[in-house]
């Protein structure tokens, strides 16, 4: 992503709590359970990039670029609390949905709005986050995709001259 947007990004560049090395959205799957330190965490959904990242890094379409690449990051829920320290390994202990990588889920949600069947399959994964489950189930039922403009651009919408508002 750094090469694509022409910026050097450091740790926590996107306000993340965990930064992983060697585990990308192509390998990580919805429902994956990890032990890290004394805690146990589970991937619940891809991150939905928003306008705040674009504003922070001054790249108006940054959220769209993340969606296009599939490198959105993901959300973890705490299954078991415990102490965690920087530098500790995340050990995969369970992968209940090996066919549902984070990047595949992102592609289905944002780049395949016409595929109601896959939206329904993804929505039926019990460990998927509630907001994603609701939106995908609605899409599977109605065939409509909500407008992502407010999330993606927010107050950063360009005006009619192509300048940032």
Kindly give the residue locations of the regions a language model identified.
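Metal-cofactor-dependent catalytic cores
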Residues: 1-165
């Amino acid at each position: 992503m750094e090469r694509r947007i022409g910026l050097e990004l450091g740790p926590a560049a996107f306000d993340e709590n965990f930064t992983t090395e060697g585990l990308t959205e192509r390998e990580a799957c919805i429902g994956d359970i990890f032990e890290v330190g004394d805690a146990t965490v589970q991937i619940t959904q891809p991150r939905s990039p928003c306008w705040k990242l674009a504003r922070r890094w001054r790249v108006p379409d940054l959220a769209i670029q993340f969606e296009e690449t599939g490198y959105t990051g993901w959300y973890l829920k705490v299954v078991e609390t415990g102490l965690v320290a920087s530098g500790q390994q995340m050990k995969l202990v369970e992968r209940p949905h090996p066919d549902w990588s984070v990047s595949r889920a992102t592609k289905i949600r944002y780049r395949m709005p016409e595929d109601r069947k896959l939206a329904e399959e993804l929505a039926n994964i019990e460990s998927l986050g509630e907001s994603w489950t609701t939106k995908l189930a609605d899409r599977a039922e109605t065939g409509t995709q909500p407008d992502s403009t407010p999330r993606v651009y927010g107050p950063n919408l360009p005006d009619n001259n192509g300048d940032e508002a």
